Curated annotation (Swiss-Prot):
Gene3D superfamilies: 3.30.70.270, Acid Proteases (2.40.70.10), HIV Type 1 Reverse Transcriptase, subunit A, domain 1 (3.10.10.10). It comes from Cauliflower mosaic virus (strain CM-1841) (CaMV). It comes from the Viruses. Residues 272-452 form the Reverse transcriptase domain. This is Enzymatic polyprotein.
Amino acid sequence: MDHLLLKTQTQIEQVMNVTNPNSIYIKGRLYFKGYKKIELHCFVDTGASLCIASKFVIPEEHWVNAERPIMVKIADGSSITISKVCKDIDLIIAGEIFKIPTVYQQESGIDFIIGNNFCQLYEPFIQFTDRVIFTKNKSYPVHITKLTRAVRVGIEGFLESMKKRSKTQQPEPVNISTNKIENPLEEIAILSEGRRLSEEKLFITQQRMQKIEELLEKVCSENPLDPNKTKQWMKASIKLSDPSKAIKVKPMKYSPMDREEFDKQIKELLDLKVIKPSKSPHMAPAFLVNNEAEKRRGKKRMVVNYKAMNKATIGDAYNLPNKDELLTLIRGKKIFSSFDCKSGFWQVLLDQESRPLTAFTCPQGHYEWNVVPFGLKQAPSIFQRHMDEAFRVFRKFCCVYVDDILVFSNNEEDHLLHVAMILQKCNQHGIILSKKKAQLFKKKINFLGLEIDEGTHKPQGHILEHINKFPDTLEDKKQLQRFLGILTYASDYIPKLAQIRKPLQAKLKENVPWKWTKEDTLYMQKVKKNLQGFPPLHHPLPEEKLIIETDASDDYWGGMLKAIKINEGTNTELICRYASGSFKAAERNYHSNDKETLAVINTIKKFSIYLTPVHFLIRTDNTHFKSFVNLNYKGDSKLGRNIRWQAWLSHYSFDVEHIKGTDNHFADFLSREFNKVNS
């Protein structure tokens, strides 16, 4: 016989007789074949372990004997036995069906008690001043209005009166709340000094944040394998393409200072149980890096060179999210929170067969990882797959890029719920977060290297710092590649970047020996001088009309995405994105009209995530393009390229607006900015 500690008859009757002003009642509805709908006032009791119903609200034929009767201790210390249960009952709340696996029969003075097992099944359970919220199918919240008065209908003769075609009069309901029920500051209540706050006027105070802080505390730790918090549900396996080969890379030489640093870091990793001594036939060298990020935190970072192992293992093709797609999810959102997984990859356990493949050498010996280490090519895809599995159902208000989690909402009240749901999911799966990196309830937030603020976005300040700190004289092709990589990262914010890059890009060709001249230094200085800041770009809302403006020259094309923002009857065109590129060798031989058409096509491709499936405007100073769209090229085999372009453009819905060259401020702007660099 099972034993449970449960608020039952004596305690609940005591509560009801005193008329506890903090009681939570909600409307529920039951349907049974042959009966009219049964409407109940359900008591939500998170202190009760089980769901309990009166025998007078569920027909006798639906009750069965429990496989194992339950012995329940009640408030006065005595025990009672519950032997009747109702299986798989549907309780309709706020128009939604909530399935309850088991309801126990017990007379408590209340028709239906919703216990903690229900609250956990549809967690997170959150209480506001005028409502409670359960989460349906772990994906969307159901808002349920609280009752200010409650009655009991389940008394002798009630079920007989509820039978269809019954002529028995329904017994008079019994009032079980003689006073108006008030709501406590319990769970995450939104009540301040007796003052009810509307959704529009909600301010997050320390008191209202208390429960969020408690949830955050449950999932945060400095140990990514914290035994009190991890569920170890993330697992991974790595396979060699040729299992018969041993992958060995010769050890490195280390300075006395590096040896001392390795001593500290290896001990830390052993204490965390993320590595262990190894007898693996495989070997990769570990080394220390001390870049800007490491200097800021005052600690070198240990890195393992897995280049050879990555070539020898089978990859993982699971895609990482497209950053532009993630940004479209947050359009129009006003409040944000972000979370960082603590040493995310280390939360993924490797199976026993995979661990020897991660073996590395350092001054202290030969070790292998128990978890997925940084540097393995499969690591980002492995981790993203697990995170998508956990958070995919919350896509309407949450996006995840590897180990970065962003929660976004329209208002503070929604956000309170959304954050609670995400933290509850982390707790459920044992996903451990970094508390010091958590950003809560922000209107301005950093995500994916961007600063997102009031409908605009721009690269974070450190991107510009990296550009400015680059030396004017570069030493080799690798250094130049790093500089161009930073420019590419910020390409959405730099008009005609392709033209700016071209002279530098030419120095990376395989058949061109490395040489850095005074002219190159001057050019580098001018590039940096003209990139002293990135303008915040507008994040277009779904209802705003979009415009693309394009331009083409002999060797390059450029494009710009704009949105028309209507504010108090005034239309304002706001810049959303830039795009640019170089024409291929064959394309440079095209007629100027074809280059202008190709500029339009390339720009649409770049911004397709915004331009599908909306109707937009194409603005160009090329007179040919407007007629090109409507020309009939069918049957002319010499113009196959034009036919293909027309077919491709037909998948989009747009109007074309021709502007005079003298009015094409976009082209003038591009030329002016480019001339600044080349002058």
